């Protein structure tokens, strides 16, 4: 773990309808940064209801969204987040999905996702992916569209 990370309290939100995937993510995040505050949503509607109640100072640094969720998909959440009038639209939104369908990737990019990653198949790969995301300069990565997809 980086020394700098110990002094930074990170707040992250994960929306995924699969409880096993949420647990997998939480365990990986805990190993990467035991000080992270991770909030979880079981679907997009629950996520948006909670995000819209937060003050600007309570907004997460990152929102990780699964694409295929009941009631409101990750892409619908992304669109709502980016169309929000407040600072919510400035939050880093990472699409984390099993889908590597070019149409989903293109749609996420068009809607303003900060990054798109295909869910890794192993715990170690997930830890590596999350560590990379937490440490990268997302503004410059987003500006360089060729780095948009991380598989």
Sequence positions of predicted segments:
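Conserved sequence signature across two-component system core domains
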Residues: 15-16, 25, 41, 63
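Receiver (REC) domain active-site loop signature in two-component systems and cognate sites
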Residues: 69-70
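A Lys-centered signature of the CheY-like receiver
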Residues: 119
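Short, glycine/charged-rich "phosphate-handling" switch motifs in NTP-dependent
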Residues: 114
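Non-catalytic signal-transmission and effector/linker regions of two-component phosphorelay proteins
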Residues: 1-13, 19-34, 122-151
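Acidic, metal-coordinating helix/loop segments flanking the phosphotransfer/catalytic sites
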Residues: 40-62
């Amino acid at each position: 773990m980086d020394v700098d990370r110990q002094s930074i309290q990170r707040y992250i939100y994960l929306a995924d309808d699969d409880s096993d995937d949420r647990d997998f993510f939480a365990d990986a995040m805990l190993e990467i940064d035991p000080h992270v505050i991770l909030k979880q949503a079981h679907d997009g509607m629950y996520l948006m209801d909670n995000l819209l109640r937060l003050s600007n100072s309570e907004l997460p640094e990152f929102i990780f969204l699964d694409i295929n969720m009941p009631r409101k998909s990750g892409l619908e959440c992304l669109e709502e987040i980016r169309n929000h009038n407040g600072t919510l639209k400035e939050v880093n939104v990472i699409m984390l999905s099993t889908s590597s369908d070019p149409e989903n990737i293109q749609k996420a990019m068009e809607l303003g996702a900060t990054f798109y990653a295909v869910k890794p198949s192993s715990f170690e790969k997930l830890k590596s992916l999350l560590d990379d995301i937490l440490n990268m300069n997302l503004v410059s990565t987003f500006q360089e569209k060729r780095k948009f997809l991380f598989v």
